[in-house]
Amino acid sequence: MLTSSKLLAHSMWLEKTGYGYDLSYGEKGSVDLYNPERVSTILGYNSKKETTDIHILRYTLEDKKGLARIYTKENYSLLYAELDNKYWFNTKDEKWHNVPAGSDIKNIVEEGQSYKSTKHIVKWEKYMLNPIGQKVEIVPLQNPTSLKEGDFLEVQLYIDGKLMPAKEARIAMNSNPYIDHELTYLETNKNIKIKISKSGLQLVNAKYKQKVDDKKVVWYSFTLTFNTK
């Protein structure tokens, strides 16, 4: 492992409710409103890894912001959600601008498309030891739902079904969703061990910056969530 950097950008996860799941967006356990129209996909995987597109209910509360929600009684083993976070510019004054590509922005350091995604394990199946076919994924190398507080979960990061290059990949080494994480830059995409928090919701948080050219990049923020007893 190399240096660390603060988790500044928000992450995404599926939060169980009495009727299904809310797609939550925030940090340290607090939830912020977002534009639900940016939620592109929510999929359900059964025990045989067969997928179903789940109908997304989008609620707008104020200033185009709200949340996305699913109602489901299906016995899914895994849920996956994806949000298109649109185009961003980072400028020399350390400000971020969420405006369309080609906008008249001065003093650009980096610019590019941003995506957020999350996988939630409802019921453990062996196929979850491998990528499920999404763009970026955190893959557990054992059943994480059987772990206890203080145990370590070994994971690997994937992009396009292949091991992600360690360069520009970061991950939080603790699965507690209610604390301010440090994201650790990886030296290698092997032996990544995440410390399990107290029983309940666990959130493994990772980010990856894929270079396009000298200034253009694609940012990926992706999580793996599950519950422990």
What are the functions of these language-model segments?
Residues 62-66, 180-200:
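Glycine-centered loop-to-beta-strand initiation motif
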Residues 8-69:
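Start-of-domain marker
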Residues 75-79, 200-204:
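Exposed beta-strand face motif in extracellular beta-rich ectodomains
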Residues 9-20, 91, 96-153, 158-166, ...:
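Beta-strand-rich domain onsets/edges
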